[in-house]
Amino acid sequence: MGPRKKSVKTCIMNNEIPEEMTADETKDYMNQLSHEVLCHIFRYLPLQDIMCMECLSRKLKEAVTLYLRVVRVVDLCAGRWWEYMPSGFTDASFLTLLKKMPDVEQLYGLHPRYLERRRVRGHEAFSIPGVLEALQACPNLVGVETSHLELVESIWTYMPHVHILGKFRNRNGAFPIPPENKLKIPIGAKIQTLHLVGVNVPEIPCIPMLRHLYMKWVRLTKPQPFKDFLCISLRTFVMRNCAGPTNSLKYVPLVTGLASARNLEHLEMVRVPFLGGLIQHVVEDSWRSGGFRNLHTIVLGACKNALEVDLGYLIITAARRLHEVRIQPSLTKDGVFSALKMAELEFPQFETLHLGYVDEFLLQSRMANADLVKYGLADVVENPGIITDIGMKAVNEVFSCIKYLAIYNCPHLHNPYNWISDHSRWTRLVDINLVRCHALKLDSFGQFIELLPSLEFISLDQMFREPPKGCARVGLSAGTGIGVSSALVSNQNSNNDDNNAQNNNANIHDNNHHHPDDSDEENDFRQDLQPGEQQFAADALNEMEDIVQEDGEVVAESGNNTPAHSQAIIPVDVDEEQAGPSGLQRVVKPTSITVHDSESDDEEDSLELQEVWIPKNGTRRYSEREEKTGESVQSRELSVSGKGKTPLRKRYNSHQMGQSKQFPLEESSCEKGCQVTSEQIKADMKAARDIPEKKKNKDVYPSCSSTTASTVGNSSSHNTASQSPDFVRTVNSGGSSEPSPTEVDVSRQCACSPGGSEDSEAMEEGDAESSVCPRCCCHRPQESQRRTSRCSDEERPSTSRACVVNGPDGTRSAFSFRTLPQGGSSGPAHDERTNGSGSGATGEDRRGSSQPESCDVQSNEDYPRRPLTRARSRLSHVLLVSESEVAKTKPRHAMKRKRTADKSTSTSDPVIEDDHVQVLVLKSKNLVGVTMTNCGITDLVLKDCPKMMFIHATRCRVLKHLKVENAPIVNRFDYAQCKKLNMDQVLDQILRMPPERNRIIYLRPMQQVDTLTLEQKLFSGPYPYHICIIHEFSNPPNVRNKVRIRSWMDTIANINQELIKYEFFPEATRSEEDLKKYPKYPWGREIYTLEGVVDGAPYSMISDFPWLRSLRAAEPNSFARYDFEDDEESTIYAPRRKGQLSADICMETIGEEISEMRQMKKGVFQRVVAIFIHYCDVNGEPVEDDYI
């Protein structure tokens, strides 16, 4: 206090300061308050702030001393129980503090960050003995709240009368269980809530006061840890993944002790190997006295020996108050619900059912079962649930009031539509969550959703996976139950349950289980709520137990009688898992062949193409849409040139003298790009037989050797040797008789065929006069002599290059096949592969003068076009090479290309196949939102969803399109890491919706985005909204701008609505006349750009939102709130910092601008749309993000 008094005297003596200011500064209002008022104020302040006031003045020091003398409840963490107490305490200072509080009874927040185990002489520290000494200095102390294991054990030992307040939860839990985390619980410990995570505990004794016991990753070290277990006041018992005794008999005292807790409400046992049938017998003995009668939550997960009767007895006993049941996969069976159905019970409060429940730790942990057993956990081998559609029908007949349904990995569920019956209407179901039920049929699911009257939320995870590529081509169904493969992959062989169980435990679930026996449905099982009649239920459950045992025998017998063909299928090398309609499936690869992903190889080829053929001033053209399979063009005689069953292939160098006349070509539409006909297979066999005969009449260079090329898998008629649609042809079109020695391997053959083998053979076989290659569309001269190619199989010219042709003038010209959008079509356009010439209709599709013209190749006719599938959308950025540019480049040999095969095909075919179209049609009058994660759906259709509000799609690889027929109020769209999403189509669908709501669209694309084209389409389109496009470049992702935009986009719309409705402000329109009136930038809008940096990452916003710039630049008003963390430096616009809390307040701020726009007669839209694009995934690699 000395320095303060000294400074005051100095100020008084200073003649430059006015006297009235000195008087105001010296006046101390706090000292005018009484001690009683100050003590009353201290009740609302944290203890740390109270202690700081002690040094401000003498009166405040007296008030603090008086307050501490009478205080009875002290919180060292100011109510924040999750934080640590203030640092800086030592044993002496903590003792001094508590001595000032002689009447303290309850001490909360004793959470020291670190405590020494013992004192060290001469060293000031904060230690356990020092804390105990300070606590013992408080004579009236009743309870202490702490989270320190050693401290609470010391309190129990030296101060047993002190209660442990609140919830004891240790903060250093981990798995594997740290050996230093130890706690010995004494008998009769005074504690009500005990949460232990990652602790070594000898035993759980008798604790009469204990109400809530939560044990996770707890190692019970004594051989009989539950010998004295008795907690009669227990309400919650949770035991998850604990390392206890392996002998099931040692859990008998645990279950009997739980039965003695008459008020037990929550029972959760995960990986507890109690004795099978134990719960049944304990319930039989205790239900009359109230054992397990008050349960409202039952959770059984990975309990090795649990039987259906154990679960059934618990459910029946607790029927009156039961709210939630989570059932482990081994108990997820039809028989359980058939027996409960026959009990004829009512569950008036039941709401939540989780089938196939697997604990999160087992799902997220990468440890195998052997690793968990090594750390002391029970040895559990978990199989997927085997409940069928019959059991699901019984579910709702038993639990008629169910609201929340979650199903995990039940591979025997097929038709949800069959879950509905006269007695099973699912009338109260609000939320359905399906995970990895891979056999569920999409159309049946859509019909099921339509019949649910109260459904509001749908969550789909790893559902409706796309079938592997190539299955439709060879007639396989890949687990869908349709076609030839159903006999090979159906659920008939259960002789490898061990493998299935291990994979299921490691979050890799297979579909190798036997269907349950239907005899469970015939149990005559009746149950009433009267105590005297419940013996009938016990007898019925005994019968159910016998039937279940018989079922087990049947399954075992079927496993031993597995057909021989199923056992003969032995994988050579399990490489990795691929997601198909049957969940995650193993892909079997022969060890002698390296199989590469077709898409990745095509990307490599396109990169190689750019390195070889891109000139310095080469331009690039972007295709607008690549959606549907184009038309496949084949010649009439060459329709069987494709190969279906891997014929023998020999490579020749086709060369012919003179020129030949052209043969007309016809186009045939190809619905599926990989279908094989019997005619093609016969042609393959015939071509293979004819090759050796024709070889006899050919002149071969002496130095050349004829090699036979073996191919990987099968190829289709237009995909025989090419996967990329943008491919190189090197042809001698001049008609010279002899090739130059340096170009004999490259320029004398059509590169679309491997050495000119099959197509050359088929060409001469069909029509010797035709000189048009059926695939690359290059004219090749007919040859009287054929020479085998010098190049080996590995040196085969790549077929993914730009076409290079020797022109008549000797120069090397080039053309590349391009994807050209159909002009003027707003819907899905059919993309066509055409040549690069600037003549005909092809030239009309080119925009501007940025595209160089390519040369004509011997004639102006249209060349055959290969189909472009939606799966090829990543090859849309392809350059066009002009004649003059290629003339400057030096001739080079084609790059080496690896053999390609799509590793996601079941037959390892080197084919390009379109994604299997799967359309999810939603029609529900109460549906609010749908969330999809890792689903194989390609199209989402909102047919009739009047209450739908949001759509979330994350990591849906093949999701491409959205169609909105009737969903007027849907306003939030979230598409994150959807690899093949057609952004243009989705945005067009959303913006064409009637402007009844403001809408926000969040996109995280995984491909490059042409921002200029996107902005042009949105701002120039017929969309009656004010539009805002935000480009966010933070990596890792920052959600600050995304979250904050929702707080102010509605404010802009509210201002517009106020002006239009009450101020007679003109409303803007976006009709066809308006589009014709404003054909150029800014298309009748006031477009501006805002840029900035948030948390070190730049953002850019392009918008025509009115009023926003003025509101951002305005000064804060009297309503400004500074308790909000954001300002313009950390987000785009912070209205609360400005005090702009409502539309009325904002209109006062921008009144001048409103008058100007009224005079200019510029209208505004009532609704706004915000499009938020996050660019952290555009390189194709998904960024880890906790927010999705």
UniProtKB/Swiss-Prot annotation:
The keyword Acetylation does not apply. GO terms for cellular component: cytoplasm; cytosol; nucleus; SCF ubiquitin ligase complex. Residues 703-740, 849-861 have a biased composition (Polar residues). A motif (Nuclear export signal 2) lies at residues 307-316. GO terms for biological process: adaptive immune response; positive regulation of neuron projection development; positive regulation of T cell activation; positive regulation of T cell mediated immune response to tumor cell; protein K48-linked ubiquitination; SCF-dependent proteasomal ubiquitin-dependent protein catabolic process. The modification Phosphoserine is found at residues 598, 600, 606, 736, 740. It is linked to Neuronopathy, distal hereditary motor, autosomal dominant 6: A form of distal hereditary motor neuronopathy, a heterogeneous group of neuromuscular disorders caused by selective degeneration of motor neurons in the anterior horn of the spinal cord, without sensory deficit in the posterior horn. The overall clinical picture consists of a classical distal muscular atrophy syndrome in the legs without clinical sensory loss. The disease starts with weakness and wasting of distal muscles of the anterior tibial and peroneal compartments of the legs. Substrate recognition component of a SCF (SKP1-CUL1-F-box protein) E3 ubiquitin-protein ligase complex which mediates the ubiquitination and subsequent proteasomal degradation of PDCD1/PD-1, thereby regulating T-cells-mediated immunity. Required for anti-tumor activity of T-cells by promoting the degradation of PDCD1/PD-1; the PDCD1-mediated inhibitory pathway being exploited by tumors to attenuate anti-tumor immunity and facilitate tumor survival. May indirectly stimulate the activity of transcription factor KLF7, a regulator of neuronal differentiation, without promoting KLF7 ubiquitination. This is F-box only protein 38. It comes from Homo sapiens (Human).
